[in-house]
Design a protein with these regions (language model features):
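Short loop/turn segments that connect beta-strands within beta-propeller blades
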Residues: 92-96, 157-161, 201-205, 265-269
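Bacterial N-terminal signal peptides that target proteins for export
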Residues: 2-13
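Residue-level detector of Asp-centered blade-edge/turn motifs that repeat once per structural unit
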Residues: 69-70, 115-117, 180-181, 224-225, ...
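C-terminal motif of bacterial Sec signal peptides marking the signal peptidase cleavage site
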Residues: 23-24
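Blade/loop signatures of beta-propeller domains
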Residues: 31-51, 147, 151
C-alpha cells in the first residue's frame, strides 16, 4: 500500500516505529495474551485510550504492520538503509524474532496474512518483472508516490514458500487484504486505466471492479463480517486537479492529497463518504461490531504535520 516516507517528506509526521497498543486486535475472536515489555513512557500526556505500549522495531523504516489471525505475529514491510528496497517480514511479537518472507528481490509492499487460519500470506512485489531495486522517485515535481508498473500481487506459504502471482496484468496491482472469512481479497489496480478497487477470489479468479470514478481508490479493508468495505479515496474535481492527476498517472505516479474515507457494500453498492475535509485521512478500519471506524488524520493540525487516531 502507498505509504508516507518520513525521510522524503516533511509535510507529514508519522510514527517511525511499529507499536503494539492494548486497544485489542480488531479482528480477533478471542483476546490473545502476550508477554511484552511495556514502555508506557512512550504514551503522551493526555492520551486516555492507551493502556500499554511496547516498541517493536528500533532501526530502519518499518511500515504497514498487520496482525495474524491469532494475534501473535505481525507482517510488515521494512528496509534498513537509503539504498535498499522494502521487503516483507514476519515478526513473532513476544520473542521479537523476525523472518524474511518475500523473495529479497525487487521492491515489495502491502502484505497481509491469509485469514482465517494464518496458513499463508499475500503481498505485492516487482520481482517477477525486474529483480533489481528500482531507483528512487524523482521529486522535481514535488513529493509523489510511485506506482511501479511491475507490482503484482502474490500469495505464498506462511514462511514465504512457493510465491504465486494472483495478478499478472500490466500496471500497478497492490494494496491487497483478505476478508476475515478468507473468501475474498480486495485490492487496488490500474488495469482499467485508473486506480480502482477490485475484488477477487483467494485463488485469483473472479476479478470484479468495485469503483469507477476518476481518482485514487485504495487502502481498503473488509468489515469483520465481510459485508462492508472501508477505504481512502481522492477524486479530482477542478480542471487543474484533473490535469495534474492524469499527468502524474501517465508517469505511474500520484501526489499526496486530501484523502477522504468512504464505505460501501462488499459488492460495490451503496457508496458513502464518511469524511469531508481538506486533510489527509489514512488507515480506516472497522471495529469488530461494524458500528465504528478508526482512522488516522491530520485534520486537527493546521500545518498538516501531526496525525492522530
Amino acid at each position: 500500500m502507498i505509504s508516507l516516507n518520513r525521510k522524503e517528506i516533511n509535510k507529514y509526521v508519522i510514527f517511525s516505529f511499529v507499536a503494539v497498543l492494548s486497544l485489542g486486535c480488531f479482528h480477533q475472536r478471542k483476546p490473545t495474551k502476550l508477554k511484552l515489555d511495556f514502555n508506557n513512557s512512550l504514551i503522551l500526556s493526555g492520551e486516555s485510550h492507551f493502556k500499554n505500549m511496547s516498541q517493536l522495531t528500533f532501526s530502519g523504516e518499518n511500515a504497514e504492520a498487520y496482525f495474524s489471525a491469532d494475534g501473535r505475529k505481525l507482517i510488515y514491510q521494512a528496509h534498513d538503509g537509503d539504498s535498499l528496497c522494502d521487503q516483507i517480514y514476519i515478526m513473532d511479537i513476544e520473542s521479537k524474532s523476525v523472518e524474511l518472507v518475500s523473495t529479497g528481490a525487487g521492491v515489495t509492499t502491502c502484505s497481509f496474512f491469509k485469514y482465517p487460519n494464518d496458513n499463508g500470506i499475500i503481498y505485492s512485489s516487482t520481482h517477477m518483472d525486474n529483480p533489481d531495486c528500482p531507483p528512487k522517485p524523482d521529486f522535481s515535481r514535488g513529493y509523489i508516490w510511485k506506482l511501479y508498473p511491475g507490482f503484482n500481487i502474490f500469495e505464498a506459504g506462511l514462511g514465504g514458500s512457493s510465491p504465486r502471482p494472483l495478478t499478472s496484468s500490466p500496471g500497478y496491482d497492490a494494496e491487497a487484504t483478505y476478508s476475515f472469512d478468507g473468501k475474498k481479497i480486495i485490492y487496488t489496480s490500474l488495469v482499467s486505466g485508473d486506480l480502482e478497487l477490485w475484488s477477487m477470489n483467494p485463488d485469483g479468479s473472479g476479478k470484479q471492479q468495485l469503483t469507477n470514478r476518476l481518482g485514487y481508490d485504495g487502502g481498503a479493508f473488509y468489515s469483520y463480517d465481510a459485508s462492508k468495505i472501508v477505504w481512502r479515496a481522492y477524486y479530482p474535481e477542478t480542471e487543474e486537479e484533473i490535469a495534474d492527476y492524469k499527468s502524474l498517472l501517465a508517469e505511474n505516479s500520484i501526489r499526496p492529497m486530501a484523502l477522504q474515507i468512504w464505505t460501501m457494500n462488499a459488492d460495490g453498492t451503496n457508496k458513502e463518504q464518511i469524511t469531508n475535509n481538506n486533510s489527509a485521512n489514512f488507515g480506516p478500519f472497522y471495529f469488530p461490531n461494524g458500528g465504528k471506524i478508526i482512522f488516522s488524520s491530520n485534520m486537527h493540525d493546521p500545518k498538516g504535520r501531526d496525525f492522530d487516531l
